[in-house]
């Protein structure tokens, strides 16, 4: 048996090792990006394509979901879809959620239809005048292709909060933050939440940030910074690797205005998961933090208080860096992204047919089970291990586990014993083995074990099975007289005296 029976602490260690993501390669799992794209109404085609699909040192942004702010119109959003689908290296499967024209600039949801299912959009409206939120907040609800459970869904709040550091600006951001948290608290607790975009917040001590991330009586709407990097970000070189603004303007790179805050459930070690060591502070000495998939795309830390470094940019190289500066258009932002690992998918034999089983015997069977996650879609590193145990009906004996399996390899093989051939009348038998897993869609997968009861050996030819009697002798003589293969007990292809001797010997010995 090649089944990989494990203890649970091994699973935790495996998840920790898998979380180390050196280099933030695109392709595996689900990559979600946010980008304030600077008053966009079309154009900048080459720069956007290079920024998104350009490659440097095997790295590319290549998101699966792109949530944009400062989109000016439906035509602007449609232009983005066209630009992404026509970009060299694009899979060409980009679609957009509905565009809603609110006050000021707006958000847009772009997503790859091969990976993402659009579920709906909800608006948290802006406030009139200058009293609160200057722009609508969009909540985009999405699911994953191939998954149905609520725990695989995401509700993403796209924000573009009030700019400025004055007390009035901060008060208006607080109003917006409260509105987001109040809405998130009403969602089903199983749904994952995320807030992303241009927060325009200078410090984690400001009231809006505390409202979003702080402990409250109802924590269903609480958000967390996956890279655990609080502080006073503005004009502070300690945060030079996570700054996002401004790559092109006179102020230079000195603010962490653009962020992605997430549900704590995305770091609990089960189901849909952040790829990285959730809650571990981001490195302060390198952009290439192996503990995180979270990146401020294009910021290699060499641009503090100046425009984005192009020549010698160690994260994205000159071509992508120039494209990012051009898209920012003199007062813009860098994209931010992170990667999520999708849950494992349990798969197993649906039926194990033991065939003909001699009455009263105990026979062995084999069951294949393991991780059937779609590696063609999500990549082997983008799918969580599946963990499972086995539970069997009476008459079946199997090691319950627990077990773990990674996607993309061969399934585990489990041997079991079946003591089911107990019907002297013959006929079929059946029993079930249940595969109990952490697959959110199929927590219980039932495997049917079937077979047919036959005589205890070849001379036990008639019911009741398990006893050699007058009826077995009649059955043998009848088969012999008709020249049937069933009477060829010695298997030499000829019905003769030696078959009669063989029957007599077996008859005398009886059933085991």
Located regions from the model:
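Acidic active-site catalytic centers that drive phospho-/nucleotidyl reactions
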Residues: 36, 64, 198-200, 258, ...
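Bacterial N-terminal signal peptides that target proteins for export
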Residues: 2-13
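Feature for long, exposed domains in two main contexts
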Residues: 342-456
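Acidic glycine-/aspartate-rich tracts in secreted/extracellular proteins
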Residues: 38, 72-73, 85-86, 115-116, ...
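Short acidic, glycine/proline-rich loop/turn micro-motifs
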Residues: 166-168, 362, 488
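Divalent cation-coordinating acidic motifs and surrounding scaffolds
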Residues: 26-344, 383-384, 449-454
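Cellulosome-associated attachment modules in secreted, modular CAZymes
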Residues: 452-512
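Boundary/junction segments of secreted and surface-exposed precursor proteins
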Residues: 19-32, 344-361, 454-470
């Amino acid at each position: 048996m090649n089944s990989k029976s494990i203890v649970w602490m091994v699973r935790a260690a495996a998840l920790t090792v898998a979380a180390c993501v050196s280099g933030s390669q695109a392709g595996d799992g689900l990559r979600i990006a946010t980008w304030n794209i600077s008053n966009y109404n079309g154009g900048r085609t080459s720069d956007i394509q290079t920024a998104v699909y350009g490659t440097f040192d095997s790295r590319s942004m290549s998101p699966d979901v792109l949530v944009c702010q400062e989109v000016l119109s439906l035509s602007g959003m449609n232009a983005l879809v066209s630009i992404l689908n026509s970009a060299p290296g694009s899979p060409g499967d980009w679609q957009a959620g509905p565009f809603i024209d609110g006050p000021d600039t707006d958000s847009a949801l772009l997503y790859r239809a091969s990976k993402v299912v659009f579920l709906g959009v909800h608006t948290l409206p802006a406030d009139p005048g200058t009293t609160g939120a200057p722009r609508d907040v969009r909540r985009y609800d999405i699911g994953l292709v191939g998954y149905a459970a609520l725990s695989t869904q995401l509700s993403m709040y796209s924000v573009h909060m009030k700019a400025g550091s004055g007390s009035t600006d901060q008060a208006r951001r607080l109003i917006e933050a409260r509105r987001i948290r109040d809405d998130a608290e009403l969602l089903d607790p199983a749904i994952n939440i995320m807030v992303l975009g241009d927060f325009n917040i200078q410090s984690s001590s400001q009231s809006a940030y505390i409202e979003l991330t702080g402990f409250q009586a109802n924590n269903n709407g609480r958000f967390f910074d996956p890279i655990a990097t609080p502080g006073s970000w503005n004009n502070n070189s300690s945060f030079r690797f996570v700054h996002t603004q401004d790559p092109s303007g006179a102020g230079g790179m000195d603010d962490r205005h653009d962020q992605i805050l997430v549900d704590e459930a995305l770091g609990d070690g089960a189901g849909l998961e952040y790829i990285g060591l959730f809650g571990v502070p981001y490195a302060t000495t390198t952009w290439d933090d192996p503990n995180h998939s979270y990146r401020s795309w294009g910021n290699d830390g060499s641009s503090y208080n100046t425009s984005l470094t192009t020549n010698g940019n160690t994260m994205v190289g000159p071509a992508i860096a120039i494209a990012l500066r051009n898209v920012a258009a003199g007062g813009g932002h860098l994209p931010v992204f992170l990667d999520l690992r999708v849950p494992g998918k349990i798969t197993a034999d649906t039926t194990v047919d033991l065939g003909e089983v001699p009455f009263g015997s105990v026979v062995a069977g084999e069951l294949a089970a393991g991780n059937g996650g779609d590696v063609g879609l999500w990549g082997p590193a983008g799918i969580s291990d599946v963990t499972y145990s086995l539970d069997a009906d009476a008459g079946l004996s199997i090691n319950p586990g627990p077990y773990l399996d990674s996607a993309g390899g061969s399934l585990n093989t489990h041997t079991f014993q079946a003591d089911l051939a107990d019907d002297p009348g013959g006929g079929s038998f059946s029993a079930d083995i249940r595969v109990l897993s952490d697959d959110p869609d199929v927590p219980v997968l039932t495997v049917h074990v079937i077979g047919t009861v036959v005589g205890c050996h070849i001379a036990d030819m008639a019911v009741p099975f398990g006893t050699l009697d007058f009826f077995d002798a009649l059955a043998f003589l009848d088969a012999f007289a008709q020249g049937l293969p069933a009477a060829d007990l010695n298997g030499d292809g000829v019905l003769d005296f030696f078959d009669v001797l063989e029957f007599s010997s077996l008859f005398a010995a009886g059933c085991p």
